[in-house]
Amino acid sequence: MKRKVYVGMDVHKETIQIAYLTSNSKEILKEQQIKHNEVQIKKFIKKLKLEWNEIHCCYEAGVTGYPLYRYLKSLGVNCILLAPGKIPRQNTDKIKTDKRDAIKLARLMRSWRIGIDSCFPVEEDEAVRDYLRSRDSLRLDLGRNRQRLMKFLLRKDIKLLPTTKYWTVSHYKWLNNLHFNNEILQETFNDYYSRVRVQEENLKAMDKKIQEIAESEPYREKVGILRCFRGVDYLTAMFLLCEVNDFKPIQNGRFVHEFSWTCSWRIFQRFQKKTNRDYVKLEVPRLRRILTEAAWQHRFPGTGSKIITARRSGQPALVVALAEKASLRLHKKFRNLQPKRKKLLK
């Protein structure tokens, strides 16, 4: 019986393109396509186990999620789930087919040029992450419906007073008192307005549920530590925990930049030219937005507000010191990035 076989998989909704090779042979042993269901996968793995002792599989993370990964693990197969940004790509590699992708993954896995596999969440953490992403989608839908409502009013030449801000108590009073002589226009306005109100209530309910999850185990301690930092509350802390999932590989801020692509475009171009690799920002857009919004709170120097002091009560002194150090550093960075104003000559 032979020892090792390396299997590259290009996974789709209905099918899986497979290519596998051994450590001794440079040629692909076999290529085939199977249906994406447990019966066909189990049959394929059982056939491989009759010929090889060790089976190493890998596939690229995508919209199919983690069920295939968990199922292969349950069959006793060593499976690696790869993040798309971790796969090395050549500038000359312009042709992309299922067959070529499967062969490339198998060869990369055999030569161990794929690095570490992406950290995947357990089913409970994945459920919380999906709930957070659903909340983010609701936030975007609410913003779109608010725009539709205001554009509808603008088309009818109904404008808000310049002194009144949008979506405040006075704005809602103004909307409640709006009436149209045309019955169809009134129904249209009611439809737009009711969507906004319903989604606002749903958003508040989801925020309340997220806070309850954050205050329960196993998130309570980690959320409490993250809330010591300015700009981080329950929602931001839960997004960080669920999107990053594992903070152990993170050694410094540069790793976070590479993971979330929060660096500037100039640094990105310099890094791309140095490594001669093409990167696309397609992994964690929500994490980039959350980190940017949190960092934006450090425009002003920290004055030790009552809210931050209450969050830090009961937390380790080392965490509080690091949070204060980070706040001062980010504020200093913001001040250095500001354009220098020339003094006016008298």
Curated annotation (Swiss-Prot):
InterPro entries assigned to the protein according to its UniProt record, in alphabetical order: Transp_IS110-like_N, Transpos_IS110
GO annotation terms (biological process): DNA transposition
Cell division among keywords: no
Pfam family, one: DEDD_Tnp_IS110
Keyword annotations from UniProtKB, A to Z: DNA recombination, DNA-binding, Transposable element, Transposition
Domain of life: Bacteria
A single GO molecular function term of this UniProt record: DNA binding
The protein's role, per its UniProt record: Required for the transposition of the insertion element.
Family named by the database record: Belongs to the transposase IS1111A/IS1328/IS1533 family.
Protein name per the record: Transposase for insertion sequence element IS1533
Organism this protein belongs to: Leptospira borgpetersenii
Name of the gene this protein is made from: tnhA
